[in-house]
Amino acid sequence: MDPLSLVLQTFGVRADVFFTGNLCNLHDFTEENGQRGHLHILKSGALDLISKSGSRQRVNKPTVIFFPRGEKHRFVPDPLTGADIVCATLEYNELSTNPIAKALPPELVLSMESYPKFPKICDALFDEAFSDEYGRVTAINRWLDLFLIEILRVCLMNKLITTGLMAGLADSKLANAIVAIHTRPAENWTVDTLAAEAFMSRAKFAASFKQVIGQTPASYMLDWRMILARSLLKNGLAVSEVSEAIGYENSSAMARVFKKVLGVSPKQFQLDNM
């Protein structure tokens, strides 16, 4: 499985459209504590975008306006034309650890004409958004999910993400080690064995991993195992099954680490989340 698919499958993000049509009045957007992101796609017309900092920019051609963590922003539509636009929220799984939410810049404004695949997806998206067909909302959300994948590809290929897991996945050597951790969490990984996966020397791998990911390999491995443990416990697996799946010798060892990291025992976590 390719690295981006692995992240999307594991962490997940889902688009939910809340407006399609001509925006003709001033509108403010905000999310409490960055719980959701905002994705806007301008089809035609024009608007002024006012960001949280107070900066103002004119947007008058097909454009993607993306606030991954729901930063406060305002749209002031052109009084003559308004703005034909699709607006959606983004719901993240495991928000506190979701690398998609954490890694992206707080604001992205991307012109459609600069990215050849954008118009191809958006033509189908706009056909649904500005129609009255049955199943319209569900279809829009599916196209938005596809469009989000293309946005993430653009960010990775153009190095708009510089730190964190997503940046690591854009590095072909580090990506090998990250995919190994994600797909084989039960293995007894060490810096040496991960460096071998990355085809790098031990010292160079450790330094590069820390610089790009922002964590040591051991710290990242621990975080990943705890993310998996939470997911498996929520799905009803026994503590013994979870400990085996993520590489602990026994359930007691896993329970000690789990409580140290999360402040609650695996059994209590499972009871609280069933």
Give the role of each language-model region:
Residues 179, 183, 188-193, 200, ...:
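Terminal helix-turn-helix DNA-binding modules in bacterial transcription factors
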Residues 1-17, 28-30, 106-110, 131:
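A short, N-terminal "cap"/entry segment at the start of jelly-roll beta-barrel domains
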Residues 259:
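DNA-recognition helix of helix-turn-helix
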Residues 108-116, 129-144, 148-187, 191-198, ...:
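Short, Lys/Arg-enriched, Trp-marked, Pro/Gly-tolerant hinge/linker segments that flank
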Residues 100-123:
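Aromatic/histidine-rich interaction motifs
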Residues 43, 119-130, 178, 182-185, ...:
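Regular secondary-structure segments
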Residues 15-106:
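N-terminal regulatory/effector-sensing and dimerization cores
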